[in-house]
Amino acid sequence: MEESLMDVPSTSGTQVYSRKARKRSHSPTKKLRYVKRRFSLLRPEDLSVIVQPTHYVRVTFSDPNMWYLRSGHHLHSVHNWLKPYGGQPVSEYHITLALLNLTDEDLARDFSPIALFLRNVRFELHEFALLRKTLVLNASEIYCANIHRFKPVYRVNTAIPTIKDWLLVQGFSLYHSGLPLHMSISKLHALDDVTRNYIITMPCFRTYPQQMFVTPLAVDVVSIRSSNQGNKQIVHSYPILHHPGF
């Protein structure tokens, strides 16, 4: 609190000083800081339920020995390197395209148009990465005039967005995991964090760039284990009919 001095005449002829208090002015914004805010009552429509996926759409491929390897290592060699560390090969190779929350009515519908969208589509598998506790290969949809003649490879993004748009238009509920497009290769769940981080930096994964080309054979709609008493079940499966010679 600021104080000012003022002269006051004294009866004894001497000059004395008295102090007059002056209040400091406060800005309106500071006063608002202490105003109690009123909150409206919570309404049912204000609540949102986080729905977990029940099924996923995936593409499957032929035997890995049939895949075209342009550079890097075959997968059986990778598994041989990881075996002493406790790495477990995945039971099947696939790429997940979408996560869905499906009802019994949804499961009775036709998902075959997805196979049409993937006609004459190839995927490139490249760059080993550690995704949570799994060794994966990044995946990209590609266009290449002739993969066997080392023609330029163009990474495109057309079929998968089309599939997701079609699912939304059909009224299906999509779940966004935030994970990049990938193919799981080996489970490293039994390893500690230090060993997992060491594996991903091993020279065998970094010396030569990994590049493989795979052609999808079928589209599956599969139930997630947690939503089906821990059992995975293929609900629908549709073959992908590529053009002859593709």
UniProtKB/Swiss-Prot annotation:
Keywords: Host cytoplasm, Host nucleus, Host-virus interaction, Inhibition of host IKBKE by virus, Inhibition of host innate immune response by virus, Inhibition of host NF-kappa-B by virus, Inhibition of host RLR pathway by virus, Viral immunoevasion. One of its GO terms (cellular component) is host cell nucleolus. GO terms for biological process: symbiont-mediated suppression of host cytoplasmic pattern recognition receptor signaling pathway via inhibition of IKBKE activity; symbiont-mediated suppression of host NF-kappaB cascade; symbiont-mediated suppression of host type I interferon-mediated signaling pathway. A motif (Nuclear localization motif) lies at residues 22-38. The keyword Metal-binding does not apply. Residues 1-28 are annotated as: Disordered. Residues 19-28 have a biased composition (Basic residues). It is found in: Host nucleus; Host nucleus, Host nucleolus; Host cytoplasm. Signal peptide: none annotated. InterPro entries: ORF4b_MERS-CoV-like (IPR044321). It comes from the Viruses. The keyword Hydrolase does not apply. Interacts with host KPNA4; this interaction inhibits the nuclear import of NF-kappa-B complex. Plays a role in the inhibition of host innate immunity by inhibiting the interaction between host IKBKE and MAVS. In turn, this inhibition prevents the production of host interferon beta. Additionally, inhibits host NF-kappa-B by interacting with host KPNA4 and thereby preventing the translocation of the NF-kappa-B complex into the nucleus by this importin. This is Non-structural protein ORF4b.
